[in-house]
């Protein structure tokens, strides 16, 4: 009987530790390209579940890919994706025109120095908006743990 109580206590403690490790945040992005202005890099790296509302663009997706080191779940169901043209988006090392309401090319896939591509392996789930028209080239390439 004592062993059973000890095992239950250990299991309960493990569940509590796992639950406390999850960090969920919700942000409203008023202007496309300004997501990172809403938090510090340390705060971004702690987030495991992120809900975004408002307006995003390819610059925001680059930050989601490169700076949210523990991001597992991303909910953008109540966000719109604005058109962006420039070199600061997700496409590696070139000027690119990112259409509105499309998941940008290479959104969660980064080109490394040796020209290989690495996906965001922490990402397990993404909830898209009904307004999403298209998923551009290699947006989720290499995201091995992403479930549909």
Language-model segments: residues:
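Consensus positions within tandem repeat domains that build extended binding/scaffold surfaces
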Residues: 106-107, 136-141
């Amino acid at each position: 009987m004592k062993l059973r109580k000890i095992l239950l206590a250990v299991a309960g403690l493990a569940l509590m530790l796992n639950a406390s490790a999850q960090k969920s945040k919700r942000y409203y992005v008023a202007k496309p390209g300004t997501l990172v202005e809403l938090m510090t890099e340390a705060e971004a790296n702690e987030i495991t579940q992120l809900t975004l509302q408002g307006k995003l663009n390819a610059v925001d997706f680059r930050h989601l890919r490169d700076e949210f080191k523990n991001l597992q779940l991303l909910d953008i169901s109540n966000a719109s994706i604005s058109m962006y043209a420039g070199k600061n988006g997700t496409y590696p090392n070139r000027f690119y025109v990112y259409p509105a309401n499309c998941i940008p090319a290479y959104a969660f896939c980064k080109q490394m120095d040796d020209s290989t591509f690495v996906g965001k392996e922490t990402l397990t789930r993404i909830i898209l908006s009904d307004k999403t028209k298209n998923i551009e080239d290699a947006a989720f390439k290499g995201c091995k743990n992403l479930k549909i």
